[in-house]
Design a protein with these regions (language model features):
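Short small-residue beta-strand/loop micro-motif enriched in glycine and branched aliphatics
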Residues: 1, 97-101
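A short, structured beta-strand-centered segment in the mid-to-C-terminal lobe
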Residues: 1-9
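Short alpha-helix boundary/capping segments
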Residues: 4, 103-107
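C-terminal cap/loop subdomain of S1 sulfatases and analogous C-terminal strand-loop tails that border
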Residues: 10-13, 18-88, 92, 97, ...
């Protein structure tokens, strides 16, 4: 069957490891998709949102370098272009083709603020946790 769960590319490695009977490596940020594949109930529930980062990946570098992040829920998608302080906000239920950018809409200001907070949280939790840092022991 088909699932409409929100998933990320980082979920693939933990899924393959679980299928091979191996534990995820320390610091892996993905979540195994195995429950979705087994259809353990919540077939359409995996994540509340998905996160994406874009760092100047065009075939021709731009100035200033392009740096954008995105958070998407089932209902909304918010893209923040950090290099220009511009953004995009779409209501995916009302506008699945993403044609009407609501970034500047006063009627969507509360949704925008909530998604910006959600984006900031995802950015904070997505920082590379490795290598594990040790506190040096001081002799004294």
């Amino acid at each position: 069957g088909r699932s409409y769960a929100l998933v990320e590319l980082v979920d693939l490695a933990p899924t393959l490891l679980e299928a091979a009977g191996l534990p995820p490596a320390p610091g892996m940020q993905g979540r195994s998709l195995a429950p979705l594949l087994r259809d353990d109930g919540g077939r359409d529930q995996h994540r509340d949102d998905v996160y994406c980062e874009y760092y100047n990946a065009l075939d021709r570098p731009a100035e200033p370098p392009q740096h954008s992040t995105m958070v998407r829920t089932r209902r909304h998608k918010l893209v923040l272009h950090h290099s220009t302080n511009e953004g995009e906000l779409y209501d995916l239920r009302e506008d699945p083709g993403e044609n009407a950018n609501r970034w500047e809409s006063a009627a969507h200001a509360q949704i925008k603020t909530g998604l910006l907070i959600q984006l900031a949280n995802r950015m904070a939790w997505t920082v590379d946790p490795l290598p594990v840092r040790a506190t040096p022991q001081l002799e004294g």
